C-alpha cells in the first residue's frame, strides 16, 4: 500500500487468517497493489475498517440511553463448515467453545457496568453458553437469525406488543465440559433425553410476560395396550395480566428400563389464554411416542409403569416450572419398526 509492503505469505494454507492494521488519513488517496497465486480454494483478501470516532459515539450513546439493547451473538461468517477462520473459540468453521466471542463478552460487561438496564438480543444459529449474561442482563431474547422482518418482530416483543411464547428446540449447555466427545457415540449424557447435569437452559425452555397454572391432570385411559394411543388432559389458567400463548409439553419416563431416556417429549400443544382465562387442554400422544430404543437398538413398547409430566417445560431444573405429574400402566409389549 503506497509502495509499502504490508504482508506476505508463501504458504498455501488458507485455514489461517493474517491481519494487518493501518491508520488511514482523511483526504489521502492510497494506492493498493495485491499479487497472489491461488493454488487451492477459499482464498480471500478484503479491506475492513472502522472510524476512529466510533468508540466516542458508542460512549455518548450509552450515556444518553435509558435502556440499552445489546444485539450480540454469532454470524454466518463464524458458523459453517470448512471456513478459513482462526478466531478464539472457532476452528475452520467448527466451534471449540460455546461461549460468546471474547470481544462481545467485554462489550456486554462494559454496558452492564454503565448501570443502565441492559436487554440482550441473541443472533445465532446454535446454542450459546451465555452464563455471564444470564446472571447480569435484565432480560434475554433469543432471536436466532430472524430474516427480513426480524427487526420488527424483536421490537414488538421488547415493547410488549405481544408475549413471547417460543421454546428452545435444543439444550443450551454452560460449557463444552458438559458435552460428550464427538467421537463417542454412546448416548450417555447426550441431548436432553440422557443429560444428567444442570444446563444453562433446558430443551423446551422459554419465558412469558405472564404466568400459568396447571390443574386436574387426567388420561383417556389408565391402562394402555401395546397398540394403543394415549391422551393427556389438564386445565391451564393464565394467572397474569397479559394475554399470551402457553406451550403445554408432555414428557414421558420409563422407570427401570435399561437404555430408556431419562425423559422424552411425547407431545405438545400451543394455546392462547386471555388474563384470568382457563382452558381444558388435551395433548395427543401417538402409540409410537410411548416406545423407546433399548440398549440393543430395538424400538419397543414394554409393560410397566409410565411416568408422565405435563407443564410449560421439562420436569426438572433450577427454574421452577408449573406442571403436573401422573402415571399410567402399559399392559402389553411390542417391537416397532425403526
Residue ranges, per PLM feature:
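C-terminal non-catalytic regions of proteins with extracellular/luminal or membrane-system context
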Residues: 1-338
